[in-house]
């Protein structure tokens, strides 16, 4: 969530200024509208990440989405004033799809870690998203936009490697109900 939601929060806060400073002649309102495409992808992408996790597996889905996120940010690092603005917006929205879908994929894993602590684990995941945003925006205060995007891509690459060590949940987990009976829940 550090790399997914953290980068979303950071990018959403800097993207209008990035467009304004990168493309001559844009008004602040137009730059903001163009940048809103990044956040708009959330409506479709986040549920899609969760759905894909349920259908094809959590580890595989998270791996593909994190890799796509890293590639997307590498592409964003190449945007300059010579780019055609619609192409820059499309690249931004494509990157955003992987970011937002990755968030859904992260939360597909959360209830399988320790079912009785799902709320606490979800809260910790959310907190790490905020920590990611603070870290990325701190980096942005010292570097240019291109380097900022590359730092996010590099951190996503590290997360990609870490995901490869994740055990894919399989079989069933036991849930003890209030009456003392045990219910088995399929996790595949």
Which stretches of residues belong to each language-model region?
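C-terminal ends and interior cores of transmembrane alpha-helices
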Residues: 67-82
């Amino acid at each position: 969530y550090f790399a997914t939601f953290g980068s979303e929060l950071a990018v959403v806060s800097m993207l209008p200024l990035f467009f304004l400073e990168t493309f001559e002649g844009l008004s602040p309102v137009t730059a903001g509208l163009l940048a809103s495409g990044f956040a708009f992808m959330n409506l479709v992408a986040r549920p899609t990440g969760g759905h894909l996790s349920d259908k094809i597996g959590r580890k595989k889905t998270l791996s593909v989405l994190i890799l796509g996120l890293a590639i997307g940010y590498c592409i964003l690092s190449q945007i300059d004033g010579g780019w055609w603005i619609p192409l820059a917006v499309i690249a931004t929205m494509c990157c955003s799809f992987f970011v937002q879908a990755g968030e859904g994929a992260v939360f597909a894993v959360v209830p399988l870690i320790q079912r009785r602590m799902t709320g606490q684990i979800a809260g910790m995941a959310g907190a790490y998203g905020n920590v990611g945003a603070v870290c990325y925006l701190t980096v942005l205060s010292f570097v240019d936009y291109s380097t900022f995007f590359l730092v996010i891509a590099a951190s996503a690459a590290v997360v990609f490697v870490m995901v490869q060590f994740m055990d894919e949940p399989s079989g069933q987990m036991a849930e003890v109900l209030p009456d003392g009976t045990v219910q088995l829940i399929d996790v595949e």
